[in-house]
């Protein structure tokens, strides 16, 4: 949000008061609109600061960025102001990113931790035998489902 960090702290407290759970993730303030403009969350002509702007003026696209340990953006989810974020989906994606960064796998649609993943098509069957000695279920040559430990 383009609000200052102090405003976010108040919002976080409100969330805790209402739900019993406080957000536990980093939040930044962007009162100079630098980040919001850089990532196209506000129009380029939005001015130079959030000061003097109305709440409607400061209504950024609500965007979730997942940044990897390599400091590269791994996921961008954009939500309109009228729609709350789906934290189950955000956590599911983080689980998938962590799994697929460690193993030569991809996760299918609606995958959840504990479910089968897909061996990357770039992995030969010979290499897959070494990587996944438990075997796999090949629906197609490029679609090899494997139990994930």
Predicted regions and their residues:
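Chalcogenol-based redox active-site neighborhoods
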Residues: 1-149
């Amino acid at each position: 949000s383009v609000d200052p960090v102090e405003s976010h702290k108040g919002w976080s407290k409100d969330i805790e008061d209402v739900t019993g759970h406080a957000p536990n993730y980093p939040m930044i303030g962007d009162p100079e609109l630098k980040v919001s403009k850089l990532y196209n969350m506000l129009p380029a002509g939005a001015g130079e600061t959030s000061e003097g702007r109305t709440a409607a003026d400061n209504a950024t696209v609500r965007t979730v960025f997942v940044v990897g340990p390599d400091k590269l953006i791994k996921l961008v989810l954009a939500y309109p102001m009228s729609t709350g974020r789906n934290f189950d989906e955000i956590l599911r994606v983080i689980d998938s990113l962590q799994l697929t960064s460690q193993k030569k796998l991809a996760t299918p649609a609606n995958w959840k931790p504990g479910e089968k993943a897909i061996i990357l098509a770039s992995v030969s069957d010979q290499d897959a035998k070494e990587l996944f000695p438990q075997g796999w279920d090949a629906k197609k040559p490029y679609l090899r489902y494997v139990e994930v430990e």
